[in-house]
């Protein structure tokens, strides 16, 4: 039987906008260490600091597989998306809003999948996690329940208990935001035919910002607004002086 050498990523070409987003967000920059199971996802190693470079084509291929798995579930609300990291909470919440999944953020209470006595117990069909190390309790319980697990994994993360590993830098707020943003776009593209690269500025909604950074952004915005008002006022005064009617000026 002849082998089909067609790559999964060839079915949906990665848009240039997504390539730029992955690079700008440093999604392709892994750690300095790696394991054997992750070696197939590596593009190379940066000589000056020994940073492992993740192959963007491998990331795209796994994002497509993850999106197909998601679309195979009839009720999206039965898919649990977990992130215990602070900067992973906003991307998870925005992702779930976009695709209809159930977010579980903050501390993952042991027994949330396995103990019916827990105050809020979940019975998901699929699990998605942002980090196999930080979310290891959720992955452990998913193994007890035989839940298919999708995970964003870095170069030194364990792949034990993971069915679909999406190779990506999961220790950067911008990278994890880009990952969930692109995955949500792929899911909606497969389900409804929505454009992949419509309004790329929406990725900002997935990005976590701490209070200090938000204050700086507000101050910068206020300065820009003030400068623009002053410039407009100055131009208006100058234009009025240059084109004013003599009778109007004399009336004062």
Swiss-Prot record:
GO terms for cellular component: cytosolic small ribosomal subunit. One of its GO terms (biological process) is ribosomal small subunit assembly. It comes from the Eukaryota. GO terms for molecular function: structural constituent of ribosome. Keywords: Cytoplasm, Ribonucleoprotein, Ribosomal protein. SUPFAM superfamilies: Ribosomal protein S2. Signal peptide: none annotated. It is found in: Cytoplasm. Required for the assembly and/or stability of the 40S ribosomal subunit. Required for the processing of the 20S rRNA-precursor to mature 18S rRNA in a late step of the maturation of 40S ribosomal subunits. Belongs to the universal ribosomal protein uS2 family. Component of the small ribosomal subunit. Mature ribosomes consist of a small (40S) and a large (60S) subunit. The 40S subunit contains about 33 different proteins and 1 molecule of RNA (18S). The 60S subunit contains about 49 different proteins and 3 molecules of RNA (25S, 5.8S and 5S). Interacts with RPS21. This is Small ribosomal subunit protein uS2. It comes from Encephalitozoon cuniculi (strain GB-M1). The gene is RPS0.
